[in-house]
Structures are given as structure tokens and as C-alpha cells.
């Protein structure tokens, strides 16, 4: 990361175990404000655990995670809830409410967390994010009428409507066809450009990694093995990185 940039996420000496299984082993990582970081690695190497610790869904055993200037582990429940409004989490499966229309799904977290907003302001913000994800015409449809790629974009829009400063994406293109994957990759890039958010993107998709990431982090066995640009990481002589590239490259 370039020196002198303001830090959005600062992770130092992070350890996490589940029983006898040590998932993270001394992870260090910085994410600058306005930077997209892609975290790559085999299944089970601790990638998803890492971002769940960042947003306070899990607690580390050792180490520190400072998000937007606050040590996550030490926050009270009220302060943690306030921080989570600034940290958007896009899960692998977009858990939309089937009985609600698209606009109602997106408005739900806004109305729950910002009760002072008028109905007119809520509708305005919902339409704005739908326009950002290029799905304004679906506002009155139900989730069952949407494709997998559209559901993923609506899930992202539901997070964006809260105007977060950080986005966490967990396998954003998993299960999508190539065209939908390209649309999601473009959306992630555009969100950074339009909203200036920082992001950690967990993925196995090398096309996603190359098109969305300012910097790549390669993890093996709970440790950051290599970080740098896409070219720097995959020109590495490390045999495990070569093997990962050969296995995942399409």
C-alpha cells in the first residue's frame, strides 16, 4: 500500500481458532480509504473468517482489528451496531425477503436504522441505489422474478442504501454465469469509483480479482503468503501460488 494514505482497516497479528483448528495465524493487513483489496486462497484458509471478524460477527483470539479508527473487539454492543452501519456486508447468498418487492427489500434496512427519514427520502434513496446497480425497472418485482445475478445486485443495493464507507464482499460471483459475473465485477469497480468506499473482496474468481482489485492478497493456511498487484502475485515463483493460478485460471 502507498505510504501517506488514510487507513480504513488495520489488521495486526490476527489469530483465530475453532477448537483445535487454527484458521488464522498472525494475519497483518491494511486497507486504505478508497482501496479495493482482493483476498484469494483455497477453501478453508480463513478468508471468510477474516471479514467476519472485521465486521464484528466473530471475535479474534489474538491481535487487533481497527476499522475506521475503532478497535472492533472493544466496542460496546451499541457502538458495534453503529459501526456496522458504516460497513456493508455482501454475503454469498443474497437473503432477500420473498414476500417483499425489490424496493421494499432495499428500503427495509433504511427504515429500520434511519427512522427519521421521510417516506419521500426513503423512496429517493432506494431509486438512487437501484439506478446505481442498473435495476431501476425491477423496483416493483419480487425476488422470485429475478435472475441470480439480479438478486446479487439487489443484495448489494440493499447494503449501499445505508451509504457505508466500507464494503465486504464474500464470493460475489459464486454461482453466477459468465455474463452475470462480468456485471458484478463491473458493479464492484463502479461502486468504488462512484462512492469512494474501501472494500475487501473474497473470491476464487481470478477474473474478478484482476478486474476489481487494486491489490491482491494471497492466503494459505491462515497466513498472508503474498500481496501486491495481480501481476506481482501471479508472477511469483511460489509453487502454491502457481498451482492456485493453474487450477483456477479459465
PLM regions with names:
Residues 161-165:
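A short, proline-enriched helix->beta-strand linker immediately N-terminal to the Walker B motif
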Residues 178-180:
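Helix N-cap at the start of a conserved alpha-helix in ABC-type nucleotide-binding domains
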Residues 55:
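Helix-to-loop junction immediately C-terminal to a conserved catalytic motif
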Residues 100-108:
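Short coil-to-helix segment of the ABC ATPase nucleotide-binding domain corresponding to the Q-loop/switch region
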Residues 71, 118-137:
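Conserved ABC ATPase "signature" region
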Residues 142-146, 150:
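Conserved ABC ATPase signature
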Residues 167-170:
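Catalytic Walker B motif of ABC-type/P-loop ATPase nucleotide-binding domains
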